[in-house]
């Protein structure tokens, strides 16, 4: 992955990106890719903490069979990391962390990622609200 960005990947984000990249060739649909990202994200960084606080588990709470959506074209892991770096730079963040990976995933996968999160127990909106609450609490401490 390209390391020429002003904001380096945090350790958690680097791990999520690497694990996500290894899973993409085996995921034939956008839904399967979103599942892989969720399972990896929920274990790492601020996003993982927020997902666990919301009760987002490894397995889906219910299984629904939506029509398959083709995966994004190209090297999706590279696209996710590149967009995450751009978003972190716009925010003038010191690092590209799992929060920016999540924002990039939501942008690239759109409704597919939101639907996958809902099947695990929380919407993207709820997850972003929880992350905001965690950031506010950290600033107040």
Residue ranges of predicted features:
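Histone-fold recognition with a strong bias for associated Lys/Arg-rich disordered tails
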Residues: 1-141
């Amino acid at each position: 992955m390209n390391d020429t960005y002003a904001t380096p990947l945090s350790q958690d984000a680097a791990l999520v990106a690497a694990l996500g990249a290894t899973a993409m060739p085996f995921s034939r649909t956008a839904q399967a890719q979103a599942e892989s990202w969720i399972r990896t994200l929920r274990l790492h960084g601020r996003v993982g903490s927020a997902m666990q606080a919301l009760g987002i588990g490894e397995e889906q709470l219910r299984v629904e069979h939506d029509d398959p959506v083709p995966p994004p074209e190209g090297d999706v892991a590279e696209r996710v990391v590149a967009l995450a770096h751009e978003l972190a730079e716009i925010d003038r963040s010191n690092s590209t962390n799992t929060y920016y990976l999540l924002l990039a995933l939501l942008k690239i996968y759109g409704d597919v990622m939101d639907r996958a999160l809902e099947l695990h127990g929380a919407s993207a909106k709820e997850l972003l609200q929880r992350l905001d609450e965690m950031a506010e609490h950290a600033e107040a401490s």
